[in-house]
Amino acid sequence: MLSYNRFRGYLIPQIHALKLFRYASTASTSGEKIESSERPYDVGMLLRPKTKFEIKTYKPISPGLRHLKRPVSDYLWKGKPFRPLTVAKRKKGGRNETGRITVRHQGGGHKQRIRLVDFERKVPGVHRVIRIEYDPGRSGHIALVEKLNSETANKSYILACDGLREGDTVESFRSLLKTGSNGEPVEMDPVLAAEIEDGTFAAKNLKPGNCFPLRLIPIGTVIHAIGVNPNQKAKLCRSAGSSARIIAFDGKYAIVRLQSGEERKILDTSFATIGVVSNIYWQHRQLGKAGRSRWLGIRPTVRGTAMNPCDHPHGGGGGKSIGNKPSQSPWGVLAKGGYKTRRGKNVNKLLVRDRPRGKEKR
């Protein structure tokens, strides 16, 4: 088995030789070396071992611990959040202003504060990661960052990507691509445009956690926190372990393949963050007991066949039978193919390929 140092010495030249960018570097094709004071890659970020598949189990001294499973996240901050970036969460128990339940299975739970996460990343410059924190309002983790060499030392929360740790640096390059009032990009600095054209810009700055306009991201790059429009916040791929991939460019659009298999067009002046959202093994957790669901504010889900006829169409009757009727919701909406969400074809003009359904393969 190769040692870490031998593996490191073998992998670095291979990484430098790969053509991972949308535009191949003219220096690399001619055999010349790129003269730069910095390494073209953040080697520490590339060679750092990814989050290992480790699930923490507990000694079954109680029924609630027997089936409890959690992803190992020893790098998380153990203290309280940065209070100026939080607001109080006023829970309503799933009820509207009239007091009626509009969303079932909600209520109770531990007291929480909402973390104000920056999904726009408009502040340029290098930011240092102070710590990685747990956020009760989302499945992924968040990172508290602070801008370097700033008089105000503004702090903000961003969505942490997989592999991001305390002391790392991230940067947003959204301000490089200026857009006019009509959303079209304006002329760019000639020096910067030349670096983008020959691939040296991507070689120096492309690393997980950095935010770029889609136009500056090479084909094949894994991204998350994707903005649909240039002037809006990130809306796609924000949950734990989610990501997308740029597969092509078509005019002013970038074609992105989502995890569901759907391929859609997004304006290349929109932005995205490099990498995968953190806490990638969140889907393998097991709460272990009903009480932990109640701590999360989730109330029990009662089967319709266990209710009375006045409460559900499946209720009443002898035994567990629902009668000679199709499965349906409490409001009579058919559960198996009776409710359509699309009223016609080609509703989304930016959809290139729909996600696989049924037995279709991705």
Curated annotation (Swiss-Prot):
The gene is rml2. Residues 351-362 have a biased composition (Basic and acidic residues). It holds the Pfam family Ribosomal_L2_C. Keywords: Mitochondrion, Ribonucleoprotein, Ribosomal protein, Transit peptide. Component of the mitochondrial ribosome (mitoribosome), a dedicated translation machinery responsible for the synthesis of mitochondrial genome-encoded proteins, including at least some of the essential transmembrane subunits of the mitochondrial respiratory chain. The mitoribosomes are attached to the mitochondrial inner membrane and translation products are cotranslationally integrated into the membrane. It comes from Schizosaccharomyces pombe (strain 972 / ATCC 24843). This is Large ribosomal subunit protein uL2m. GO terms for cellular component: mitochondrial large ribosomal subunit. The keyword Mitochondrion applies. The keyword Cell cycle does not apply.
